[in-house]
Amino acid sequence: MIGGHWEVVVVGGRIAGASTAWALAPYAQRILVLDASRPTAFWPQQSTWDRDGNLAWAELGLLETVLACGAPRTYGDTQRIGEDVVERVYPRVDAYSYRMSVPREVLDPALLAAARSRGNVTVLRPARVRDLTIDAGRVRGATVRHGGVDSRVTCDLLVLADGRLSHNAQRVGAGAYRVVESPWFALLAYYENLPLPTDRSYFSLQDRSVLISTPCGDKQWCVALDLHQSLIDETGRHPARSYERMVRDDPRLGPAVAVGRRSTSIGGAGRMRMLRRPMSGPGWCLVGDAGYHLDPVTAQGTRAALVTARILRDRVAGAGRVVGADLTGLTDERDAALEADWAYTEQIVRG
């Protein structure tokens, strides 16, 4: 039975939602995580982070979980800018000085399993919120559909981690107060058995495009392309066809993919919006892309999601428990913590 009362209901069980459930578990008796996806869903998104991201995982106590996903650590990259090639080595500041990229199909289940291991976290998938219960301006619960059955639950805190297109954010009145339209289209696919180094990434920065290859598992690579909308309009070519052509014609990746094989379809999205919504209100809180979405062109979204989860965790930890925690002022705290990431990404997006 999922009905009844839960201290926390988390809507969304991916990076932000699973990490938040894990982080809040010590401060609640019962946490319910609702995720609309099925366990086998393919997410055409690349989760990449550098030293700052490693520190963010460590602050939440999840770094070992992430490392256990088996993705190689990269300590440098090859950059092709026009026809010039530069080899870079990342500064070795400490034990966190490396980059990683983990497929979402591996990372997300690992984080959900970690949350579940707390013992007081229940995960339902696929499950959707059909409606919210709001009384006197405060969120009190939700109507949840799971297995074709609707159930009503009550909660002390509703955490929305259901992405940049969150309908539930609209339901609680969390409208976007800052929006930046992006002209970039992001695509990716996964490849196997490429004859490429496993300790470094590859970046090809060309006219209105960025092509990236990153090792992300045992004999597995993520090949991603950021494509400017003006180039799509100019060529009239479907973005997936441009992806295939640009990968094939790249002097480094072309020969590599001819030897290996693509193991997934090409997926992606375009015409996305960077946005900021309020982080908290009476009985609710937004984490991850639901409240703060950065264009994926700069690969800062994973760290941003972890920062929002950590900010909420720290506020609850200061109160000792979820019930009664004062969540006012979180929006300003989050925006200050992520201002550099926003400014950098907005600069790239606006060109």
Spans of model-derived segments:
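Conserved N-terminal helical subregion
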Residues: 3-4, 73, 78-171, 180-184
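N-terminal FAD cofactor-binding segment of flavoenzymes
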Residues: 43-82
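FAD/FMN-dependent oxidoreductases across multiple families
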Residues: 235-327
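C-terminal helical "tail/cap" subdomain of flavin- and related membrane-associated enzymes
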Residues: 314-351
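Conserved FAD-binding catalytic core of PHBH/FMO-like flavoproteins
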Residues: 149-151, 162-259, 263-265
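Beta1/beta-strand and adjacent pyrophosphate-binding region of the FAD-binding site
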Residues: 2-16
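Glycine-rich FAD pyrophosphate-binding loop
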Residues: 25-45
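Conserved Rossmann-like nucleotide-cofactor binding loop
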Residues: 16, 39, 165
